[in-house]
UniProtKB/Swiss-Prot annotation:
The gene is cyaY. This is Iron-sulfur cluster assembly protein CyaY. Keywords: Iron, Metal-binding. Gene3D superfamilies: Frataxin/CyaY. SMART domains: Frataxin_Cyay (SM01219). One of its GO terms (cellular component) is cytosol. It holds the Pfam family Frataxin_Cyay. It comes from Photorhabdus laumondii subsp. laumondii (strain DSM 15139 / CIP 105565 / TT01).
Length: 106
């Protein structure tokens, strides 16, 4: 993958997350801000989730209360380089844990 392909895939992921959060109709207050390629999700309990792109490694990094994770693009999805879990699955779990309300991506 070249840098241009990486940025296109990373942009698609960020736009998808933003769209899902915009359509979220649950009770938890989840604020979403994207600035300079870094997405910050903020919750009522003052916890945050940070999603950012690491261009030199062609990775997406996820920082949650539970820890930090690095994701590589493999076979059409972002996969954790340690656990092998899907990015959206891990993000949904982190949002559920930090918001106190069940969250999932379609």
């Amino acid at each position: 993958m070249n840098d241009s392909e990486f940025h296109q895939l990373a942009d698609q992921l960020i736009l998808y997350i933003e769209g899902q959060l915009d359509n979220y109709d649950g009770n938890a207050d989840i604020d979403c801000e994207t600035n300079g390629g870094v997405m910050t999700l903020s919750f009522d309990n003052d916890s945050k989730i940070i999603i950012n792109r690491q261009e030199p490694f062609h990775q997406i990094w996820l920082a949650t209360k539970g820890g930090g994770y690095h994701f590589d693009y493999k076979e059409g999805q972002w996969i954790c380089d340690r656990s092998g879990d899907n990015f959206l699955t891990m993000l949904a779990y982190a949002i559920t844990e930090q918001s106190g309300e069940q969250f999932s991506f379609p």
